[in-house]
Structures are given as C-alpha cells and as structure tokens.
A protein has these predicted regions:
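Short, small-residue alpha-helix embedded
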Residues: 99-122
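Short pre-catalytic strand/loop immediately N-terminal to key active-site residues, enriched for Gly-Thr
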Residues: 89-103
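Hydrophobic residues in alpha-helical segments
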Residues: 32, 116-117, 137
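Charged C-terminal helix
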Residues: 123-165
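Glycine-rich beta-alpha junction loops
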Residues: 27, 69-73, 95-98, 130-134
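Conserved phosphate/ATP/ADP-binding segment of small-molecule kinases
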Residues: 2-89
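Phosphate-handling active-site elements
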Residues: 88-90, 115-129
Length: 165
C-alpha cells in the first residue's frame, strides 16, 4: 500500500516544519489524523471547516497553509483557502474543469513556489499557481488522449519566465 501508517506519520512530521504547506483535503486529513474513507466529508466543506483545518495545521507548526481543492456541489469553481501565521484566511478560486489530470497538484505547488521565490506575495503566488494550472489543463484538453497523458504545461512556461521580469 502507498499510504502506510508510518508514511502518514512521517508526512505529519515534515508538515510541522513547512513554510508553506499545500495539502489537498485528503492530505490535510491524514496529517491531522482525521477520518478518511467512509467517514470523510469529501471536498464540499464550508469556509468555517476550511479555517478549522488551516488553523489545526498551523497549530502543528506550518507557517502558512494552502488548502487545495474545495469543490462545492452546484458551483462551477474550485477553491483554495490560504491562511497562516500573521495571515488572515483568504480564498482564491478558479473555474472548475470537469476532468482530472495527473500532475496538477505538483504543477500548482511548483508554480506557487516559483512565484514566491520570484518575490511575489503569498496572495499573488496562490493566484498565479491557480491560473497557471487552470490554463495548463485547458491546453492539455486540446491534445489527443489527454486524460491519460497528464497535464501539459510546457506551452505556458513563458508565464513562469515573466515572473522574473
């Protein structure tokens, strides 16, 4: 199995020292030792629940948390909530696209860190990462057999280079 209790404990230890922790809801639940599986609430959580999870992750030692992938029933956006030490919680949302692609979480985190390292604020970095990932998913959907190929971001790399300009 991929997720062993030992791996989950090690993830929680690493998370405690994070400057910017970027879990999806499943990862956040695992780090917090909260139920997943049949008892898990899924991705349709309230603002208050997002704030509770962020506060709990900060209490474990993360400086900032970007809680990714909140998708509420009947809405056409996907939300990411951000909060942390000396950072009031805020939300950044993008259009929800009705398909999943491998690598979007890694791409999002890479873009977030690129923007932070280029001197952007956490707010601007979160917006950049969400927009870049969204746009890469649209580019990917134009390719044959795209759902089996993973996210194609290469045509958009100029946007990352522009962070330095």
């Amino acid at each position: 199995p991929t997720y062993t209790p030992e791996l989950c404990d090690a993830m929680a230890e690493l998370a405690a020292g994070a400057d910017i922790l970027t879990p999806n809801l499943t990862e956040a639940a695992i780090i917090l030792g909260e139920p997943i599986g049949d008892d898990w609430c899924g991705t349709d959580i309230s603002d208050a629940e997002a704030a509770r999870m962020i506060d709990a992750l900060v209490a474990k030692g993360a400086k900032h948390v970007v809680l990714k992938g909140i998708q509420r029933e009947g809405e056409s956006v996907i939300r990411n909530f951000v909060g942390g030490v000396d950072c009031d919680m805020f939300e950044a949302a993008n259009e929800y696209l009705p398909y999943m692609l491998h690598g979007t979480g890694d791409l999002y985190c890479s873009c977030l860190m690129a923007a932070v390292m280029a001197g952007r604020s956490l707010h601007d970095a979160v917006v950049f990462a969400g927009d870049f990932t969204h746009d890469a998913m649209i580019v990917s959907a134009k390719q044959p057999d795209f759902k089996n190929r993973g996210v194609s971001f290469e045509p958009l790399l100029g946007k990352v280079a522009e962070l330095l300009g």
